[in-house]
């Protein structure tokens, strides 16, 4: 079996002295892993976030397979001096590595991930909104879409200030005030991102509130179900001092 595709490196693991096991998020074949040979001149090629032309081959689809790779773009030098941006890209890559099913195409998520890397690369002030959008989209693509469009109880679309931790649905201030200690806050940044408004600037504290919400549901719906540990780098984003 053989195919060719483009893909972003989401994990790299050394295998022996001269080989690597690469995990790629590809446009048409989803997440795939393969063995590739490490040469003296290829270290720069195999960095997380690098975009590659990849040729994967194996006797059977379920085999690890072999990867021949050509570098298309290495965006790493655009953000490596910004610690939070670097952590964000590596963190989301590690989330993809843990939760994406093997060999299942997720073209919309792939395109948005590529766009997020471009946003980071061009030093956009709105990159944090694009990051939260990625995590919401990941939940949606894997079947756990949050419904933050209206109050779960009354159906109203105004004054949505809480989120139910059980259902992932929004709750209005009027309904939720009496149960505030049992509900999650619904920060304005997350409200805007959910409604596809990604062009507003927010404080890091507001971004952190959004991270807490998306992180809660990523852990509940994906990591706990897979009996997998939530990535330490993702947790570190919450304690990062801007």
UniProtKB/Swiss-Prot annotation:
Stated role: Involved in DNA repair and RecF pathway recombination.
Family: Belongs to the RecO family.
Source superkingdom: Bacteria
Entry GO CC: bacterial nucleoid
InterPro entries the UniProt entry points to: ARFGAP/RecO (IPR037278), DNA_rep/recomb_RecO_N (IPR022572), NA-bd_OB-fold (IPR012340), RecO (IPR003717), RecO_C (IPR042242)
DNA repair found in the keyword field: yes
Pfam families linked to this entry: RecO_C, RecO_N
Protein's name according to its UniProt entry: DNA repair protein RecO
Native organism: Wolbachia pipientis subsp. Culex pipiens (strain wPip)
């Amino acid at each position: 079996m053989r195919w060719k595709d483009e893909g972003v490196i989401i994990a790299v693991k050394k295998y022996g002295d001269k080989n690597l096991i690469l995990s790629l998020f590809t446009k048409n074949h989803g997440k795939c892993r393969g063995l590739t040979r490490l040469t003296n001149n290829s270290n720069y090629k195999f960095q997380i976030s690098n975009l590659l032309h990849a040729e994967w081959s194996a006797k059977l689809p379920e085999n690890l397979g072999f990867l021949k790779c050509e570098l298309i773009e290495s965006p790493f030098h655009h953000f490596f001096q910004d610690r939070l941006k670097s952590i964000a890209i590596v963190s989301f890559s590690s989330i993809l590595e843990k939760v994406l099913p093997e060999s299942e195409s997720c073209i919309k998520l792939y395109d948005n991930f590529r766009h997020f890397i471009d946003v980071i690369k061009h030093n956009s002030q709105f990159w944090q909104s694009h990051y939260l959008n990625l995590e919401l989209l990941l939940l949606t693509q894997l079947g756990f879409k949050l419904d933050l469009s209206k109050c779960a109880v009354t159906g109203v679309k105004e004054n949505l200030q809480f989120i139910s931790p059980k259902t992932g649905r929004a709750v209005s201030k009027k309904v939720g005030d009496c149960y505030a200690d049992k509900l999650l806050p619904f920060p304005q940044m997350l409200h805007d991102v959910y409604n596809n408004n990604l062009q507003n600037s927010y404080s890091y504290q507001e971004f952190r509130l959004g991270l807490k919400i998306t992180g809660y549901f990523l852990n509940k719906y994906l990591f706990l179900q897979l009996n997998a540990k939530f990535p330490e780098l993702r947790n570190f984003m919450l304690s990062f001092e801007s």
